[in-house]
């Protein structure tokens, strides 16, 4: 199940949806563009589409952005990287005995237990999310993460969890709302359109874009 909706504040300001993502076989991915990047929504979508074109080789692909640089769509100069490639990345991979979450930046992990109880793990970075793009920017241009960034890995055993999903930090507006129970019922039953209708109905509450891969 994949949901991607623009935040109300972006509509008010005339901005595009800066979130994107995909579901490809046993891999789910979500990216959340930085509002300071002039065209981060373009880079986010290009990254997802190009990454899917590669077959989503999460284990073997270490240099995630070279596929964009080599395609001559985006160059690797600092200004171009800042304008197009500042976005957080969340992956969740389903393996035989466990789920693996790869994170570079903030977001929310949705954990469904076998009794259908939902748990949420918020990845906080104190408003200083680490963007994978920082690995390609000379340190003199950076105020944080001058030594580069890596993905953080989290493992969840399948004998404890039925499913693991991921979401951009826009999900926080649901978790702190009066309709959280309504949302969770639809999520557990994989009712994608019901969740989209809920977000449309309460759209003014959702200041930020929201993307869910579950």
Over which residues does each language-model region extend?
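N-terminal entry segment of metal-dependent catalytic domains or homologous docking segments
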Residues: 1-53, 107, 146, 154-155, ...
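PP2C/PPM family metal-dependent serine/threonine protein phosphatase catalytic domain
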Residues: 2-15, 70-80, 111-157, 197-205
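Short hydrophobic beta-strand that contains or immediately precedes a catalytic carboxylate
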Residues: 28-32, 102-104, 165-167
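Short helix/loop capping segments that flank catalytic or ligand/cofactor-binding pockets
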Residues: 38-40, 111-112, 174-176
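Solvent-exposed, amphipathic alpha-helical segments
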Residues: 46-57, 181-186
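Catalytic core of PPM/PP2C metal-dependent serine/threonine phosphatase domains
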Residues: 56-112, 145-158
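C-terminal catalytic subdomain
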Residues: 76-79, 84, 94, 141-214
């Amino acid at each position: 199940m994949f949901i991607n909706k623009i935040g109300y504040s972006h509509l008010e300001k005339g901005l595009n949806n800066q979130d994107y993502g995909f579901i490809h076989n046993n891999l789910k991915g979500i990216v959340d563009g930085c509002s300071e990047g002039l065209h981060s929504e373009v880079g986010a979508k290009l990254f997802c589409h190009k990454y899917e074109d590669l077959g989503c080789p999460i284990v073997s692909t270490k240099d995630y952005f070279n596929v964009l640089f080599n395609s001559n769509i985006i160059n690797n100069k600092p200004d171009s990287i800042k304008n197009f490639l500042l976005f957080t990345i969340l992956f969740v991979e389903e393996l035989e005995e466990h789920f693996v979450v790869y994170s570079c930046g903030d977001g929310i992990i949705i954990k469904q237990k076998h009794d259908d109880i939902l748990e949420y793990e918020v990845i906080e970075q104190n408003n200083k999310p680490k963007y994978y793009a920082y690995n390609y920017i000379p340190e003199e241009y950076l105020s944080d993460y001058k030594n580069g960034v890596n993905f953080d890995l989290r493992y969840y055993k399948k004998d404890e969890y039925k499913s693991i999903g991921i979401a951009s930090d826009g999900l926080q507006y649901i978790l702190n709302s009066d309709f959280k129970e309504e949302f969770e019922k639809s999520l557990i039953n994989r009712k994608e359109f019901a969740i989209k209708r809920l977000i449309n109905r309460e759209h003014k509450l959702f200041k930020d874009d929201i993307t869910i891969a579950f």
